[in-house]
Amino acid sequence: MDCNAGNHHKAFATNFNPEINIREITQKGLWYKNGEWIETDPLSIHKPLTYPNIGPRESYLMHHEELESLVKNYPTIKEARFWMTFGQQYLTYLDCIQNLGMSRIDEIEYEAPLADGSGKTAKVKIVPLQFLKAVLPNPQDLGENYDGETSIGCRIRGKKDGKERTYYVYNNCKHQEAYNETGMQGVSYTTGVPAMIGAMMFLKGIWKKPGVWNVEEFDPDPFMEQLNKQGLPWHEVFDGDLEID
């Protein structure tokens, strides 16, 4: 579950690299059920979900690559989905960008005036999405006026000791607190801090063994302990309503 309930007070901006962000959102959705991957049209499955200290937000089923390794490394998982929130204004602008062809990633030829003031032109090739990135607000500059908070977590249903249980572990991060500490907004903070902790685990030899491994294949306890110490405290809810069948 990935909710950004913040407001950067821009008409349209992405919280990280626009090329990656827009391509990620406009690709087909993908989720896992009973050993099979199910593909959906982009953002076609959505429902309101309630996030701690935020309330209900429309949440959209998307493809996120961590699902692919989780179901491989935890073969007892029967179903896995990733949900992310988007505001209606963001989606309206995104539709406009797509309809105008500005989300294209193929090269187009453009007749551009020369910078020497001669009035002459030259044919150049540009990628529309890369051009769009150049004119959109820089994600690094959003933090100063960003308010609100993020809420990121996992909602899990299964059996423990023969009983049906639910479990919700989550972190909320306020954009202004992240900015005051690092000069960056909360989305960057919640991305960078876990990566830093992972590097720490590796450098200290806590997460180190021959071969190539995913994060979920290591002992989670020292990682979770560091999240609490490094500015991303987490909370647990046992046997609550997950709002998802």
Tell where the protein language model's regions lie, with residue ranges.
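C-terminal catalytic/substrate-binding lobe primarily of soluble NAD(P)-dependent oxidoreductases
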Residues: 1-245
